[in-house]
Amino acid sequence: MSISKLTASNLTVTLGISMRSGYTIWGTALIFYLVFLGWHENWRGPLTESEIAIFTARAQSINGLSAEQLAHFEMFMRDDDGGEFFMVNLVGFTEGPASHPETGAKVDARELVQSYFRPFAVKILARAGYPAFSARTLSGYIEAWGVAANPGWDIANLMRYRSRRDLLMSATDEDFSDIHIYKRAAIAATFAVPSQSIGGALFS
């Protein structure tokens, strides 16, 4: 066999191996991407009427929710488009040490709230929910009108949820209600507003 034929044969084998390796890499990448999409996106559509009825009953059983909150809760469910959303959340911790709800011991509020957040984060991560943004405040309001006085906000958060169903399944979970006492004890003031992205560099 001539050298030129040997070289051509070796080149063909090398190209064949390279192509198979390329197919393997791209095939693996495609599988991972499809698995990611299956986890990250909501494939079940908006809430159904039966789901709304179930979650409404669960919400009504939660102590401390006002009639206004329940009305907002129902509107939030009925306006569901099946898409992702972000929960805008401001948090103000208790001044000084917080009282542990079980032992009464004085503990750091930021450490105490982790007893709530860590288990909750695990639950929502399983449903493709995660912190999209978290930051500490640097001062009081720079600009504000028509709002109540700043109660002392410490943290600003944006939590991403795959769907309203996923939030409601987590928020009405019995295990979640058991750990909510840590959040109540550690946080002096908070509000949470569900929002949907309309653009921007991070969330477009």
Predicted regions and their residues:
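Short S/T/G/P-rich N-terminal loop/turn motif that feeds into the first structured element of a domain
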Residues: 15-153, 196-204
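Eukaryotic helix-grip
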Residues: 191-194
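Catalytic cores of eukaryotic secretory-pathway lumenal/extracellular enzymes that build
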Residues: 182, 187-188
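Active-site scaffold segments
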Residues: 155-160
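Soluble, non-transmembrane catalytic domains of enzymes that act on hydrophobic metabolites at membranes
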Residues: 2, 187, 199-203
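Short amphipathic alpha-helices within nucleic acid-binding modules
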Residues: 99, 163-173
